[in-house]
């Protein structure tokens, strides 16, 4: 998922912040925020965000377990909880999970 919020003029300074929002068994969801700043201003403006999923693998390409993530800030907690809903939606759409099993996803509509 990639969301573009604002255009970035040529010559802007970009700051890219990437944080793991949730770790599952062998996969991690990484939330990326992109901020722009002009050369003449100190003010930063969020222009883009993206969500990626990575799978940890060993030297033979087999998935391996990743450490648990414990969110600290309110934003981290919000993204942590939303990550499970995104994962369940992805699994349902891929046919790897029955919609009836996607309890966190169903909770949005209850």
Regions picked out by a protein language model, each given a short descriptive name:
Residues 1-9:
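Small beta-barrel nucleic-acid-binding modules, principally OB-folds
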Residues 9-10, 21-110:
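HotDog/MaoC-like acyl-thioester-processing domains
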């Amino acid at each position: 998922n990639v969301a573009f919020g604002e255009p970035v003029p040529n010559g802007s300074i970009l700051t890219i912040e990437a944080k793991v929002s949730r770790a599952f068994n062998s996969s991690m969801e990484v939330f990326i925020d992109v901020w722009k700043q002009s050369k003449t201003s100190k003010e930063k403006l969020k222009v883009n965000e993206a969500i990626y999923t990575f799978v940890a693998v060993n030297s033979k390409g087999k998935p391996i377990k990743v450490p648990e993530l414990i969110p600290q800030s309110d934003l981290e907690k919000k993204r942590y909880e939303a990550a499970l809903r995104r994962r369940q939606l992805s699994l349902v759409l891929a046919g790897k999970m029955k919609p009836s099993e996607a309890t966190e996803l169903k909770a949005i509509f209850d």
